[in-house]
Amino acid sequence: MRLDALEAMRLTRSNKQDKRFPNEEDVRYQDGLLFPSIRPRFTLQAPAKVFTIGSCFARNIELTLQDYDIELPTMGFSVPETEWDFRPNGLLNEYNPGTTSQRVLSALGAREETNETLFETGEGFLDLLLPGGYPVTRERAEERRREIDAVYGELASSDLVIITLGLVEAWYDEQDGTYLNRMPKPPAFRKDPDRYSFRRLDVADALPMLDRAMEALIEAGVEHVLLTVSPVPLGTTFTGGDVIVANSYSKSVLRVCAQTLAEKHPQVDYFPSFEIVGSGGTEAFNEDNIHVRHKIVERVTGHMLKAYFPDIRPKTEGEFRTVQDDVGAEESAARA
């Protein structure tokens, strides 16, 4: 952004409430959290179809949205515990900009998915495009991919697509030119040491991939995209530094990407879930300091709904359902 001096002064004068950081007397401070003012680029009415893409925080948002008159295609996918121990649709998690973009482009027919990312072990096949899970037969791995494709068949017809950006540390298949959602098993490195590489993405890497995904969504007819940055931290870093610092870098890159995309595309807006949760410090997280407390998720999602679905009401009054966290969360993208 670049403004001439008079325009900058005009904007500052008109931004009376929000231009200064809030103290505890400010209406944006509520019970230990800071809730930025939202000026939504668009609003929607229920019933609506909302498609959620991204890290485990996207799954948390889904569980809160279930209590409203909102259709959630991703909640229709599940796998048995023999394939995945945690949330039934947790295998839909996408962590890095590469896999997120690949998934969107594949769903919209702009990219072909390769079966070479099914890695054979002594116990079966692992799908490196998924964030985890146990080995299955090749037939089941291919069947599961078709099931996921069917879910993503609802993408273009959704009223709102919410994309939660997770991290920028990624594994890459040099042979296929494909970003992976999990680290290949060490035997794969020994078998073909030049095939896989670790990449820490910067803005120059991540932004073009995400921009292609935004353009594909818009071209397919999606009118509303809401970008967020997951407040769930990176669990493990492969950069050789402290994960606390690596996480800050990761979120900073994604935050810049989200802002840039929202400023470029009229159909895209940014929602500050990352800023809200971060304002609460470690008190906003469970004891692992990774997963966000569900009551905090409810408050964040409520703030989002108030802005983008101003007339929406819960289906029934009462307590929200209990959440089962995806153990490992952002970490699962980095380790086997």
Please give the residue ranges for each predicted region:
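Extracellular glycan-modifying ectodomains
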Residues: 1-336
